[in-house]
Regions:
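Membrane-embedded beta-barrel scaffold of Gram-negative outer-membrane proteins
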Residues: 262, 365-383, 507, 515, ...
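C-terminal beta-signal and adjacent terminal beta-strands/loops
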Residues: 4, 684-690, 712-762
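Surface-exposed extracellular loop regions of Gram-negative outer-membrane beta-barrel proteins
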Residues: 318, 324-331, 440-445, 492, ...
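Gram-negative outer-membrane beta-barrel transporters
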Residues: 475, 575-579, 598-690
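Extracytoplasmic beta-strand/coil segments of soluble accessory domains associated
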Residues: 146-184, 207
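Transmembrane beta-barrel wall of Gram-negative outer-membrane proteins
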Residues: 243-272, 282-322, 343-365, 422-424
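A beta-strand signature from Gram-negative outer-membrane beta-barrel systems
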Residues: 153-154, 194-238
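Short, acidic, small-residue-rich periplasmic hinge/interaction motif at the N-terminus
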Residues: 39-41, 50-54, 83-88, 98-140, ...
Length: 762
């Protein structure tokens, strides 16, 4: 596999250097479309006029036809200024583009001021439940080195164990990098799937999922456009060095350059800390972690309408598993002997090659994306000491524990094909996703007084998704997004489902959109999720493999209202209801913090969420508030040796990640004539998780934290240094995230950490 990645890198670099053609913008491949008309105040079309679309890092231009129509088929998600200069005057509008959305705008040229005759929000693909973070916004956030911390800023998402984002009451998010899928199992690893320092923009869907997305756990969809936050384009690079409390230090090297018409973006990152995972003790023991990652993107324009792009990522992370050595701690009954040295190492490699052809009239495109991913998770348990660990029971007796060594390798290969075509009132997209996974797993369980349990397994699985969707602009004020998706999966278990999706957006008043959505979702468990837990946890009377984990099937409904106050200020409120059968849920594996997956026979989450988002030259801010109730019942499958259909008691009880109120807010203010100096205040609030699992009794106390960052962005033009001083958990507020209950380990949040970073550009 290493040789493959090296050979692919050399081949693509050679092709990029050898080919030459006219340049087009090297846009990433997570896009929507913009189309419209340009007219005068007399409603007559204006032809042969230049229309320009300008965003954070993208500038696109086109010319209107004789009928005044214009189109941009591939526009990366984000906020844009749309403008046109004509003999009759100027026309302009501010618009927001979401992935897979079609934005229709009617520009009217006037001698004094430009305006849109129809609000751009009117026909957005997702006027609610979609939020985007630009490079400028990301760079100013205090915890912008953690993708989970960014995702958890939006409504509907709760920060759970080990910073896992739980979206709308369910585990598992779908991640995409530059338009290519990044498969992830529900039993996720500790490391980051994508280093956010390599991101130029992040978009998060928590609802209104288009038919394009599906097949795996989909509490939310996270789209990432690569490029980094430091530079605004062109050639150049930067070196960032940082150090701070808790043994923290990090380094980042980036380089953007061109060779012929090819554009290269290279990033190298490394970091370490003495406080990695949430610890079972207030003062952490054995909790260091480190990570390195390398990312390369090559974009090669091949004419005015063709683009070839290549992504290559390599990551490594190592985590000491924190321990509790105090037998008298009532919050942490699992006790390890001093010196226990369990370690998890994680390796990840990813490569994708995308080819995009845009039609001559700008109203369509075709994309082909082959991709590969290799992932290895190795848990190296300190077996001799692990079997000396024990759990203190309520009556004062103790129960001895087991030791675990695990080495799991998953290899993925996939192909994504899609085609898009827009007309006056319709935007049709269809595609197919093919994925194959090969899993090799080796487990050793050492049990005091019993023979070792050894389980070596290998399996192959597939996922196939086929979809078609249409964005129909029914009237000037109503748009309908309808889609149909078919998913089929094989592996230890298999299944299939036909999933309709329907979304209606109605501008009921000027700049106010009523939104409704209905969708069916299908989630196949990854091969990594399906293991012999019943044997490993000694709940089965036989050593025969039992693979009874079933695919999850959801019905999701939402009703919302969005209002655009100005082009830089919008708000929405959204009510959601999600019901599921065979919920893919998680519990701890033995006495480790690793996740094992099981089924709940039924599950339901209901809630109401609010978002206020503002962005201007001087201020970036956002407020999110969610009230929700997540319940499940009928524990079965995986660890529990009976199929979901035979569960006797399916009374709904609060999930262990159920949190009644969750709030997030951030405020960034920019200063100085060049607006490069900034200060950000960020806050988080939660009312606490249940103490036990699905028993309905007891809650941990409410908690809150505040983070701060101040700094100045580096100036690559004048070659001036940049710096950032960030403070996580400003007031050093400590709280219990979870307590050990058989499904979760005890976890304390991290103490205050101050980190200073300096950036030298060139």
């Amino acid at each position: 596999m290493v040789h493959f990645f090296r050979a692919a890198l050399v081949a693509v670099a050679f092709v990029a250097l050898a080919l030459g053609s006219s340049a087009v913008p090297a846009n990433a491949d997570v896009v929507g479309s913009v189309r419209g008309t340009l007219t005068g105040t007399d409603q007559h079309p204006i032809g042969q006029a230049t229309v320009t679309l300008t965003g954070d890092r993208t500038t696109l231009s086109t010319t209107t036809g004789t009928d005044g129509r214009f189109a941009f088929a591939r526009v990366p998600f984000g906020h844009y200024a749309l403008s046109a200069a004509t003999p009759q005057g100027a026309a302009s509008a501010g618009i927001d583009v979401a992935s897979d959305a079609t934005v229709t705008v009617a520009l009217v040229a006037t001698p004094v001021i430009g305006r849109t005759s129809a609000s751009s929000t009117t026909v957005r693909g997702t006027p609610v439940a979609e939020n985007a973070f630009s490079a400028r916004r990301l760079a100013a956030l205090p915890r912008n080195d953690k993708l989970d911390a960014i995702v958890e800023q939006v409504p509907g998402i709760v920060q759970f164990s080990y910073d896992e984002p739980v979206a709308h009451g369910f585990h598992g998010l779908t991640y995409e990098l530059d338009g290519a899928p990044l498969p992830q199992s529900t039993s996720s690893n500790f490391g980051q799937l994508i280093d956010p320092r390599n991101a130029a923009a992040v978009e998060i869907f928590t609802g209104a999922f288009p038919a394009e997305f599906g097949g795996s756990r989909q509490g939310a969809v996270v789209n990432v456009v690569s490029g980094g936050t430091e530079l605004t384009g062109g050639n150049g690079g930067a070196l960032t060095l940082g150090a701070g409390e808790q043994g923290s230090d990090d380094a980042r090297l980036i380089e953007h350059f061109t060779a012929g018409h090819a554009q290269f973006s290279l990033a190298l990152n490394g970091s370490r800390t003495d406080r990695g995972l949430d610890s079972p003790m207030l003062v952490a023991q054995h909790d260091a972690s480190s990570s390195t990652d390398q990312f390369l993107r090559i974009a090669l324009p091949m004419g005015e309408r063709d683009l070839l792009a290549f992504d290559l990522s390599n990551q490594y992370a190592a985590f000491q598993i924190p321990i509790n050595t105090n037998p008298n701690d009532p919050n942490s009954p699992l006790v390890s002997v001093p010196g226990t040295d369990d370690v998890q190492q994680e390796y990840d490699r990813f490569a994708s090659l995308s080819f995009t052809h845009t039609s001559k009239d700008g109203n369509g495109y075709v994309r082909v994306v082959p991709w590969m991913r290799w992932d290895r998770i190795a848990y190296d348990g300190d077996l001799d000491r692990d079997v000396q660990a024990f759990v203190v029971n309520g009556d004062g007796t103790t129960t001895p524990q087991n030791g675990l060594r695990q080495d799991r390798v998953a290899s993925y290969a996939g192909l994504r094909l899609s085609a898009y075509r827009a007309s006056d009132r319709h935007a049709l997209k269809f595609g197919i996703d093919l994925q194959q996974e090969n899993l090799r797993s080796s487990d050793l369980i050492q049990m005091a007084g019993s023979p070792d349990f050894i389980d070596d397994a290998a399996a192959r699985g597939t996922q196939t998704g086929i979809y078609v969707e249409d964005k129909w602009t029914a009237t000037q004020h109503i748009s309908v997004n309808a889609g149909l998706r078919y998913d089929h999966s094989t592996g230890y278990v298999g299944g299939a489902q036909l999933s309709p999706r329907l979304e209606i957006n109605d501008e009921i008043a000027r700049d106010t959109v009523l939104h409704a959505y209905y969708g069916r979702l299908y989630a196949a468990p990854g091969l990594e999720d399906v293991r012999r837990d019943a044997v490993i946890t000694q709940t089965s009377p036989t050593a025969s493999p039992v693979y009874d984990l079933q695919p999850e099937r959801d019905t999701y409904v939402e009703l919302g209202l969005a209002h655009t106050f100005t082009s830089a200020l919008r708000a929405y409120v959204n009510a959601f209801d999600r019901t599921a059968i065979n919920v893919l849920d998680t519990t701890q594996l033995d006495n480790t913090p690793l996740f094992a997956v099981f089924n709940n026979a039924v599950g339901r989450v209901r809630g109401l969420e609010f978002r206020l988002d503002a962005s201007s030259a001087h201020v970036d801010s956002g407020v999110s508030l969610t009230n929700s109730h997540a319940e499940a019942g009928g524990v079965s499958g995986g660890t529990f040796l009976f199929p979901p259909g035979s569960a006797g008691d399916i009374t709904l009880q609060p999930e262990d990640h159920d949190q009644t109120w969750t709030g997030n807010a951030f405020y960034t203010r920019r200063f100085g004539p060049d607006l490069r100096t900034f200060a950000t205040l960020q806050a988080e609030y939660g009312t606490g998780f249940p103490v036990q699992f699905e028993n309905g009794d007891g809650r941990l106390p409410a908690h809150w934290i505040a983070d701060v960052s101040v700094g100045r962005a580096a100036d690559p033009v004048r070659k001036r240094l940049g710096y950032t001083l960030s403070v996580d958990n400003l007031f050093d507020h400590r709280y219990l995230v979870k307590v050990n209950n058989g499904f979760n380990t005890t976890q304390w949040n991290a103490p205050r950490r101050i980190v200073f970073r300096i950036t030298a550009p060139w």
